[in-house]
C-alpha cells in the first residue's frame, strides 16, 4: 500500500527502534535473577529506542522539534512541526516479558496531530493514521466498533500509578463503568488501548493523567477510524489535559456522561 513520505519516515524509524526493543525483550528473562538488573536494563532499552527514533526522524526532517518521554524537548528550527514520541509505552509489561508494549510516534503541526504510527514489535502489528486519509493496521483499513448499548461493550481503562493520580476518583469511575458494561480490561499501554479502539477490538477507553506522548498517535488513530476522542471532563483536547475518553460517537458520549457524574 502507498503511504505518504512522512508516514514512510515514521514507519522506518518505528521498525528500526522495534528491532532494538525486540532484541532487548529476549534478554529480559536472563536478568530476572537480579533485583535491580531488569529495571536498569529496561531503562537503557528505553533510551536506546528513543535515540534511534530521534536519529532517524531528525535525519529525515532536520528542522522538526522532538518531544520524547526519556530525553524531553529538543527544539527545532521549524516551529510548526514537532514529533511526539514514546519509545516504549508499556514499560512494566516489557519488564515482565509481557508482549503488550509499543513505540508511539505522533506528528503535530501547529498544535494539531496530523499523523501517527504505533508499532508493537512483539507481534509485528503496525498501526498507521494520517489526517484525512484513514487508519490502518498492517495495511487493512480500520473502523471503530458500532455497538450502541453500553451493556454490550468491552471497555479498557488505565490505573493511577502508585503515588500519582486520584485513586479514590478512579475507584468511583471504575465502579460506575463496571456496573454498565459487558467487560472492563486493563492492558497497561495507553497507545495500544487507543489503537484497539480504532481497530474495533475495544468499544471504549478512558484514562487520566497521561502525557502527550501517550495520546498523540492514538488520538488520530481513533479519529481516522471514525471514532470520537476528547478530554473526560470537557469537550476539550485530551492532548492538552491528559484525561482521555474515546469510542464511537455513542459510546464516547455515554462513557463521558458516566465518568463526569462519578468524578
Locate the predicted segments by residue.
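Solvent-exposed alpha-helices and their adjacent loops that cap or buttress functional pockets
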Residues: 34, 75-77, 110, 128, ...
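Generic detector of well-ordered alpha-helical packing
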Residues: 47, 51, 70, 87-90, ...
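Small-residue (primarily alanine) positions within well-ordered alpha-helices
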Residues: 10, 14-17, 116, 135, ...
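Short, solvent-exposed loop/turn motifs
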Residues: 113, 141-143
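N-terminal subdomain of lithium-sensitive/metallo-dependent phosphomonoesterases centered on the IMPase/IPPase/PAP
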Residues: 1-88, 250, 257, 261
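Residue-level signal for inorganic ion chemistry
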Residues: 21, 46, 57, 91, ...
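DPxDG-like acidic metal-binding loop motif
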Residues: 77-136
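An extended, acidic
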Residues: 143-263
